[in-house]
Amino acid sequence: MTQGPGGRAAPEPEAPTTFCALLPRMPQWKFAAPGSFLGRGPAAARVAGAAEAQPEPGVPALAAVLGACEPRCAAPCPLPALGRCRGSGSRGARGTPDVADEWVRKGGFIHKPAHGWLHPDARVLGPGVSYIVRYMGCIEVLRSMRSLDFNTRTQVTREAINRLHEAVPGVRGSWKKKAPNKALASILGKSNLRFAGMSISVNISVDGLNLSVPATRQIIANHHMQSISFASGGDTDMTDYVAYVAKDPINQRACHILECCEGLAQSVISTVGQAFELRFKQYLHSPPKAVVPPERLTGLEESAWGDGEVTADHDYYNSIPGKEPPLGGLVDSRLAVTQPCALTTLGGLGQGLSPAWRDVRGLPWDMGPSGAVPPGDGYVQADARGPHDYEEHLYVNTQGLDALELEDTSETPLQPEDSPKKDLFDMRPFEDALKLHECSVAAGITAASLPLEDQWPSPPTRRAPIAPTEEQLRQEPWYHGRMSRRAAEKLLRADGDFLVRDSITNPGQYVLTGMHAGQPKHLLLVDPEGVVRTKDVLFESISHLIDYHLKNGLPIVAAESELHLRGVVSREP
């Protein structure tokens, strides 16, 4: 303590107060890019001038995004911590400009290679760019990539390559074997080695990544851009591999591995980045309209495809594993979405073919408003605006009593649930092609007698629905014509009894009604695309489906139960 003028003790200087200490404790307050808070002194002005004049090359766009996502400050922080934050922010300000400034200056937030993109934009916007690579299989990812930080996501792709490199024989790519990462045991699941080791064609466009066998045009996977959440490749430790995480109905969320020898991995990952940037520009030119979702109905069944990463536990009888949402008749439900999504935490490919591209969020497209859904025969309608050409899908054996009570008591139109109306996975499973082939061989039909489109059906060019004719079904004793659910259930006496009926509410919808464990089941036989199918097998007609399961004694697997066809409930003459 020192003596001031007049002998009085001068007060001690107050400890410096951090900026966070002056703010109330409101965790929802968040300041983007604290490094941009410049001081008033000449030193700060020199720093700002240096940042504008001499940007440091080689810093990936990921740093700019992470700089804009500083952690929330919920409590006063000490001065040293603030100094570290201020120092890191200054480095970010010198090295990478703001993401918004980057978009204004260059028209994109992904750093292009020094020589520009490899392909013309018109080609990526149109037919796309194809590469011949080696498919290594995929490994299930049990956690949402959005819930993981960037380093963990990178480790997930590395660990997936590490596992498949040993499991797939004849690999030629350069890879240094590493010990299994036990920390990722709860994130990575089982592997799927079907088609592993095959030479395939990967087509990259603004629509997504399409994997197919060149010789037969068989579709292995078709991942839309909205379903791809992370991509990585061309690193120094994985120069011959590209890994990306995407969702599809067969593998759910999985990490797919492509082996690209002779430096092709960098070209592939660069083309993916170019396609994503062009898709994002399309999104900016046609942003979605905000739609106020209706109130969720209480006591009714939830949507089968859920919101975002969360899906309902109910299964469709004739859907593939993964709860593929129905298309709602002839109307493509991908053209409408109930809520716009924010594109956040976007990473870049880095300067000169950087290996990482992160967090490709869903790009919602809204092509029309949603409407009201009228009640219909105990089925949940997939698209409120679709024509009633096919009966709505039924949740099998879930809340059956509630559905019956609703059919008897509800007289007012129901409101649609606030579930998204876009199909994130626009692909029919590649297993369908094999099942169709096996089923044709079992029926004595050679592949040569079938049209090429039926030998290997292509997901985007599936033929239009062709409903069975009434004359064909009238020849079958188990067909009862137009009949309600309640009337059909009264005809069932024992387990295994079954009949086929035409829906009263939606003529042209054919439903299999059977008894299992004392409970009636109603199974939709024709999917929205006009294909007669079960969860595993495609059939030529409803008669083919019934005869196949009746003569072979095979059950129809519906959700987590089985429906056996033993006793035909014949119609009255």
UniProtKB/Swiss-Prot annotation:
Pfam families (UniProt xref): PID, SH2
Highest taxon of the lineage: Eukaryota
Protein name (Swiss-Prot/TrEMBL): SHC-transforming protein 2
GO annotation terms (biological process): cell surface receptor protein tyrosine kinase signaling pathway; intracellular signal transduction
Domain notes: The PID domain mediates binding to the TrkA receptor.
Keyword Phosphoprotein: yes
Disulfide bonds: none
InterPro entries: CEP152/SHC-Transforming, PH-like_dom_sf, PID_Shc-like, PTB/PI_dom, SH2, SH2_dom_sf, SHC_SH2
Function: Signaling adapter that couples activated growth factor receptors to signaling pathway in neurons. Involved in the signal transduction pathways of neurotrophin-activated Trk receptors in cortical neurons.
Gene that this sequence comes from: Shc2
Start and end residues of each SH2 domain: 478-569
CC annotations in GO: plasma membrane
SMART domains hit by this protein: PTB, SH2
Signal peptide bounds: none
Subunit structure: Interacts with the Trk receptors in a phosphotyrosine-dependent manner and MEGF12. Once activated, binds to GRB2.
UniProt domain PID: residue ranges: 125-307
GO MF annotation terms: receptor tyrosine kinase binding
Species: Rattus norvegicus (Rat)
Keywords assigned by UniProt, alphabetized: Phosphoprotein, SH2 domain
Posttranslational modification: Phosphorylated on tyrosine by the Trk receptors.
